[in-house]
Amino acid sequence: MNQDHFISIIPGLSDVLGAQSSRQDALELLRNNSETYRKFQSFPAGEQNKLLSFIMGQRGLKITYDSFFQRIMSPELHPGRLESFLSELMGEEVHIEKILPREGIRLAEEASLIIMDILVQLSDGSRVNVEMQKIGLYFPGERSSCYAADAIMRQYTELRGRLKEKFSYKEMKPFFLIVLMEHSSAPFQKAAPGYIHTEKIYYDSGAEVASLAKIKYISLDTFRDSVHNISNKLEAWLTFFSSDEPADIIALVNAYPEFRELYQEIAEFRTKPEELIHMYSEALAIADRNTIRLMIDDMKEELDSLTNQVAEQKSELARQENEIARQENEIVRQESELAKRDDEIARLRAENERLRRETQ
């Protein structure tokens, strides 16, 4: 497809991403720095083509990597953007009061698995952690519960230390954990076409008891498969997070012009190949570590499954052996019973024979 035809079927793309350039110009820009070009050549062919298309201005760039996301959605540089997304997701206007340090059990155990992680405190004291997973992690409920419990306990410790004897549990504020997954894991794929998964806690008696942990998962892959027209601001944000397709960019900017500024900031990387390739290289390295870790998890899960199967088979074999032993014991008992009956019959016959002789 030539460049003129591309522009004609996607009008307005140059207004958002800047004037388009040729493939040769894009390659020359990369070759200006030998180290940058060497890194570029080390990328898989598919990733090279995506980057070239971006530098040429023919498509956008996904920001589902920490380095890119932090540039565009940084609560320090652009608090209004994260506030806008959170307000749409939570159904009420929120304001970020401060950014909190990213610490705790998640970073100790899973730093290489999380490609974006932002923790903020809202004006009402609530805390919100927004994280992006390139590939949905295993055991999402267990992991999220542990992290939420750790975050809530840290809030409790801070309040106890600051308020001392004036502390009351009513001072505790909710902790919101929002997990965006570019490729969601099996439990969420089974819930398609639903793509926003909100944890609900109910008591069978109907009692209403507050819970501080508020957890939401968002399946961006299911969203892309299920939603084809942007009908509200939340869908606009999820489209921005999940798609780099030219048609989606144009549709989004036409529906919500405020996103033009975000795309233009992304487009600035077109003229900064060294920075672009460096950040992309880091992103791919993280993705590789994620893939390796998930492959290990896969193998562990398969090993656990095989171990359970072997245990079940051993248990079944033991049950069958016990059944055989029981049946053998039953046979011995029956044989013993038959032998007793044979002895009794022989005794009765002998008695009958004795009596018959006495009567003769």
For each feature predicted by the language model, list its residue ranges:
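Extended serine/threonine-enriched, polar tracts that run as long, contiguous segments within proteins
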Residues: 204-235, 242
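Short, hydrophobic/amphipathic alpha-helical patches that form generic packing surfaces
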Residues: 67-71, 179, 217-219, 236-243
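Short conserved micro-motifs at the rims of enzyme active sites and ligand-binding pockets
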Residues: 189-191, 227-231, 278-279
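Short, charged alpha-helical interaction segments and adjacent helix-coil junctions
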Residues: 8-59, 128-133, 242-360
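Accessory alpha/beta interaction modules
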Residues: 1-214
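Short amphipathic C-terminal alpha-helix that caps PH/PH-like domains
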Residues: 86, 147-148, 234-241, 263-266
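Charged, alpha-helix-enriched surfaces in structured cytosolic catalytic cores
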Residues: 77-81, 139, 232, 257, ...
